[in-house]
């Protein structure tokens, strides 16, 4: 019988102080014993490691999910399942989500605690490196939170399994559901509000867009980051103009807000559909499905589809599991401060099932007399489907890659007896990848009795409906007469179209939509301004590429670089595409013709299909002139050349070897692909991502980029310093293939490896006093007694690496080694001891990353500061959208507005007031007054045009149109300004009362930006003159309005107008005008009309 700890509880914390920096971390050894009767055999003891942060603020905190382990043991004790003579011990030490500390904890658990399996890690910072180390040490790793996504290829972690279904699975369910229901046009709406703790938006958003973009028409994609109901409502209103089927990617709290906004907008009529995606959350939507708390459903829920796992809320014992975990967490040793079941992490259920699955697998292997301590054999048993489990999270069955498959259901409000409930409507089989009706008698209660259409009958813009022709007596005769003619034309057209299609097929021109899935719409990429990025240099705009400085594709569409005389590097434009940061490499407009070639299209498709961790991901190309460009993943650290150049100290040997490994692995993949070789290998084409992993770029698409697959190195415009890494046999050719040769890649690797050894950022021949043209001439000279090569010092690195470099740059291509043998040599030259390598690498990585960030910050601080000054100044002069267009280098076209309302005001007696005041006092007076005005108008939908002296000009209805609200907005604002003016006190003349006179007029105007130096947003038209006349003919403390404004206010209702009479207006003759006296319910006092004035006027 396995021994217990000293207390009566089977779970007791044991605190100890570890070595070094872990002395102050809470450590916990969870002693969980399965006590079984033993006859003659000695009990087997298995110690299992557990990795999760202690801090309760973390969503994967031990204090939120740790008791999931104890519940497993309680079940095994109370419900024996024949696990034999085994006792279990779980050890835990806080690693605070630090990759370095997690490594130390894991190594300590393996070497001292002799753990047989690891559950975790729960933090993404440590997942990849611990997964690799666990695979190296043959220790099974159970990922219960889905952090092993970085190791997508199970080859890299062949002892890992993941119990959380991948988010790509729910995207596939959504895709098949939309196909089944026949909905082709969709909108995507969602985000994360300030008070929402949902952290899956980015990952889920990317998975959904990746799964839908090539199969459906995404008419709108809107994200929010605010909890403002007004903003949500405005975004949903805009979405409703172009989409009837709306996919919501958000938390359950935000989903309820959005559905309420739909009710407020009148979108609950049954014409709109809201599809909610649910992966792990247990709050509101679980209550909906389990009918726990929701009794009555609002009408809008009849328009809701919910996609969730089929076992969502229905696992064995699920009803009481969260309650049990919550109770255990509040007891020792966890002593969690959680106060309700809602604070228990839903991942505790996956932790529970992971441990139970491991226990059952151990027992199955014991029965089969297999070594359950062999991690690979144990994981192979799981991947073979030999062990299944009906757990808290539903059926647990793993595929051959160690990933869990979960069936999903589509839930809808259906009739069940005499009430409506959310019940399964469709069922998705994750193994067969098909979707079927849940049952034949399901009766979904849509408001209009049938499934809604994905678009209105006449289209969103009424463009699908035509006016019906008049029905006259002779119409039938006319139509009948033209039927033969129309029939002939239709048949002739069909024959012509058929012939054209056959001709195109014979010419092998690929034209069906499936052949252009790699095309990216340029407007689907959001270009990021510099201050939002943390990379060195400045993005090069499309317009700047053709200036007088030398432009080169340093990474051949991996990272466009622009060189100036001071050798400062400027990176390619960076944008956001489908949630990914991407780099854009612009190609000449002549590529529009090249991309139509079948060979180019096939190669673009091939580039999209190349997937390897050491290859820069290729997203596609934009083919719309003048923005023809190649879109690849953005690598934050720049190129290998930048890493070497910006390093103030010698790069550690472990990093150099790591970079060399990455290059070799990438080239091995390329040489085994249809591309066969790289052809342009050099430091600027070796990009480094934020994880310091090297990825190759700059290969392929030669015909698309240059119009030919051949190139000449003898052109005068060639930058010879870029040819240092090109093999001499290729340099000697009059025309050589752009893709190079495998032997040429070996030579390029040798020069590149020598650059790494010597860490020379300015080329391998920087210590040779000769022009680049001369160096290239000497390299390709076949008669040279000793071929020219860069200097190579023996003491700079391992002797085997130096010898490898010499072999790889051999003059004879046939004598150069191949990359499999190069990889073997690198492995043999690597230091021994995996623990020390990984520990050292993590420490160096943190130091190196911090150093690079300091360099980035230092080099960009001044540029960012200057740019902010310009943007701030521009925002005070022009409307925001005008400023954005000017910054983007676009011209701002004048715009005609059919109806706006303009406000003019000035100060009565301002000239006399100025004569009694000093210039400084006048400036202070105007600043105080117009600062008060500026603050007041912020609560109205108006735009301040300008101030000239004591004149103040405001307009509504532009630059953003607001329908018929402009007169209402200006009138209410004028009343507020008149009210605040009566209480305004002049600083240097407190006894004086400031008197404002105001004029309003409504009519059409033209607005535009005038000038290049100090540009202004100006208004033109007779409406401006008339508004000025209304102000100049007004009286003190009065609002003078024209007849057109009065009509608009009467239509709006609630305003008190008084007829002034007929006055003479310059240039307009006699005009009937009015006084604006007030408004119903206006909350602040206004100056009163005198009785004498009232006698003259007639109240309407």
Swiss-Prot record:
It holds the Pfam family Guanylate_cyc. Disulfide bonds: none annotated. Its EC number is 4.6.1.2. The chain crosses the membrane at residues 482-502. SUPFAM superfamilies: Nucleotide cyclase, Periplasmic binding protein-like I, Protein kinase-like (PK-like). It is an enzyme of class 4 (lyase). It is a single-pass type I membrane protein. Its main location: membrane. It comes from Mus musculus (Mouse). Homooligomer. In vitro interacts with NPR1/GC-A. Highly expressed in testis. Residues 44-481 are extracellular. It is found in: Cell membrane. This is Guanylate cyclase 2G. The gene is Gucy2g. It catalyses: GTP = 3',5'-cyclic GMP + diphosphate.
């Amino acid at each position: 019988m396995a021994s217990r700890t000293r207390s009566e509880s089977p779970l007791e914390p044991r605190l100890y102080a570890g070595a070094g920096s872990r002395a102050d971390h809470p450590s916990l050894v969870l002693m969980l014993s399965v006590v079984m009767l033993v006859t003659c055999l000695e009990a087997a003891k298995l110690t299992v490691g557990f990795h999760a942060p202690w801090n309760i603020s973390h969503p994967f905190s031990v204090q939120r999910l740790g008791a999931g382990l104890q519940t497993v043991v309680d079940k095994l004790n109370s419900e024996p399942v024949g696990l034999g003579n085994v006792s279990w011990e779980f050890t835990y030490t806080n690693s605070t989500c630090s990759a370095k500390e997690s490594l130390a904890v894991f190594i300590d658990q393996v070497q001292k605690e002799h753990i047989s399996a690891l559950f975790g890690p729960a933090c993404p910072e440590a997942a990849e490196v611990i997964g690799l180390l666990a695979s190296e040490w043959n220790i099974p790793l159970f990922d219960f939170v889905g952090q092993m996504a970085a190791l997508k290829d199970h080859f890299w972690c062949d002892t890992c399994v993941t119990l959380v279904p991948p988010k790509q699975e729910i995207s596939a369910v959504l895709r098949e559901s939309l196909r089944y229901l026949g909905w082709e046009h969709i909108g995507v709406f969602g985000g994360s509000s300030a008070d929402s703790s949902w952290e899956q938006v980015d990952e889920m958003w990317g998975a959904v867009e990746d799964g839908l973009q090539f199969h459906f028409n995404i008419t709108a994609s809107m994200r929010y980051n605010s909890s403002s109901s007004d903003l949500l409502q405005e975004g949903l209103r805009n979405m409703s103009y172009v989409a009837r089927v709306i996919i919501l990617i958000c938390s359950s709290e935000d989903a309820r807000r959005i559905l309420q906004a739909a009710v407020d907008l009148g979108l609950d009529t049954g014409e709109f559909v809201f599809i909610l995606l649910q992966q792990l959350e247990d709050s509101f939507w679980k209550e909906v499905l389990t009918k726990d708390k929701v009794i009555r459903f609002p009408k809008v829920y009849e328009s809701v589809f919910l996609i969730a796992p089929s076992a969502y809320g229905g696992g064995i014992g699920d009803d009481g599991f969260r309650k049990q975990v919550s109770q255990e967490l509040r007891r020792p040793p966890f002593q969690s401060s959680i106060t309700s079941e809602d604070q228990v992490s839903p991942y505790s259920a996956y932790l529970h099932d992971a441990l139970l699955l491991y226990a059952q697998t151990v027992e199955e292997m014991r029965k089969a007399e297999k070594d359950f301590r062999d991690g690979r054999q144990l994981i192979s048993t799981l991947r073979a489907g030999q062990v299944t489990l009906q757990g808290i999270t539903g059926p647990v069955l793993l595929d051959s890659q160690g990933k869990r498959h979960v069936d999903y259901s589509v839930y809808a409000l259906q009739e069940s007896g005499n009430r409506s409930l959310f019940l399964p409507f469709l069922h998705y089989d994750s193994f067969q990848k098909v979707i079927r009706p849940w049952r034949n008698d399901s009766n979904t209660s849509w408001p209009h009795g049938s499934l809604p259409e994905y678009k209105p009958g006449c289209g969103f813009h009424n463009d699908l409906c035509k006016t019906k022709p008049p029905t006259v007596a002779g119409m039938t005769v006319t139509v009948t007469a033209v039927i033969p003619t129309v029939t002939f034309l239709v048949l002739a057209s069909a024959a012509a179209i058929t012939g054209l299609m056959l001709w195109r097929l014979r010419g092998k021109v690929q034209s069906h939509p499936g052949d252009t899935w790699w095309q990216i719409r340029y407007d689907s990429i959001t270009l990021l301004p510099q201050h939002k990025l943390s990379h060195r240099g400045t993005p090069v705009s499309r317009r700047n590429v053709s200036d007088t400085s030398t432009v080169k594709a340093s990474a051949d569409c991996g990272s466009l670089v622009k060189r100036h005389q001071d050798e400062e590097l400027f990176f390619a434009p960076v944008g956001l595409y489908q949630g990914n940061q991407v780099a854009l490499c612009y190609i000449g407009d002549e590529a529009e013709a090249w991309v139509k070639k079948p060979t180019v299209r096939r190669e673009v498709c091939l580039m999209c299909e190349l997937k390897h961790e050491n290859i820069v991901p290729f997203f596609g190309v934009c083919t719309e002139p003048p923005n023809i460009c190649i879109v690849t993943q953005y690598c934050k650290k720049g190129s290998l050349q930048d890493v070497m150049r910006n390093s103030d100290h010698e790069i550690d040997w472990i990093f150099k070897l790591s970079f060399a490994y990455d290059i070799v692995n990438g080239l091995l993949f390329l040489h085994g692909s249809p591309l066969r070789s790289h052809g342009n290998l050099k430091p600027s084409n070796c990009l480094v991502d934020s994880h310091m992993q090297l990825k190759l770029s700059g290969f392929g698409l030669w015909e698309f980029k240059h119009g030919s697959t051949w190139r000449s190195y003898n052109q005068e415009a060639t930058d010879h310093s870029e040819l240092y890494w090109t093999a001499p046999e290729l340099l000697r050719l009059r025309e050589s293939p752009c893709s190079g040769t495998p032997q040429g890649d070996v030579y390029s690797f040798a020069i590149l490896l020598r650059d790494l050894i010597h860490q020379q950022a300015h080329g391998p021949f920087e210590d040779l006093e000769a022009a680049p043209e001369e160096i290239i001439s000497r390299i390709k000279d076949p008669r040279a007694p000793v071929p020219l090569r860069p200097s190579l010092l023996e003491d700079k690195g391992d002797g085997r690496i130096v010898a490898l470099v010499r072999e790889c740059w051999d003059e004879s291509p046939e004598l150069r080694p191949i990359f499999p043998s190069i990889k073997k040599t690198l492995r043999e030259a690597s230091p021994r001891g995996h623990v020390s390598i990984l520990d050292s690498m993590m420490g160096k990585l943190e130091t190196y990353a911090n150093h690079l960030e300091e360099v980035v910050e230092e080099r960009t601080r001044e540029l960012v500061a200057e740019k902010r000054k310009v943007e701030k100044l521009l925002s005070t002069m022009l409307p925001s959208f005008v400023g954005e267009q000017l910054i983007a280098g676009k011209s701002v076209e004048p715009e005609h507005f059919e109806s706006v309302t303009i406000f003019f005001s000035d100060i009565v007696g301002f000239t006399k007031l100025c004569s009694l005041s000093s210039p400084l006092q006048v400036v202070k007076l105007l600043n105080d007054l117009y600062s008060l005005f500026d603050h007041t108008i912020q609560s109205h939908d108006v735009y301040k045009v300008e101030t000239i002296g004591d004149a103040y000009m405001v307009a509504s209805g532009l630059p953003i149109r607001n329908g018929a609200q402009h007169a209402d907005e200006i009138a209410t604002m004028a009343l507020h300004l008149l009210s605040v003016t009566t209480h305004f006190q002049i600083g240097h003349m407190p006894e004086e009362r400031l008197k404002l006179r105001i004029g309003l007029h409504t009519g059409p105007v033209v607005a535009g930006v005038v000038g290049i130096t100090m540009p202004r947003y100006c208004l033109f038209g007779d409406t401006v003159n008339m508004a000025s006349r209304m102000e100049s003919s007004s009286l003190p403390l009065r609002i003078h309005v024209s007849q057109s404004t009065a009509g608009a206010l009467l239509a709006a209702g609630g305003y008190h107008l008084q007829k002034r009479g007929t006055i003479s207006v310059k240039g307009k003759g006699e005009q009937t005008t009015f006084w604006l006296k007030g408004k119903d319910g206006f909350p602040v006092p206004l100056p009163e009309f005198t009785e004498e004035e009232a006698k003259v006027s007639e109240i309407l």
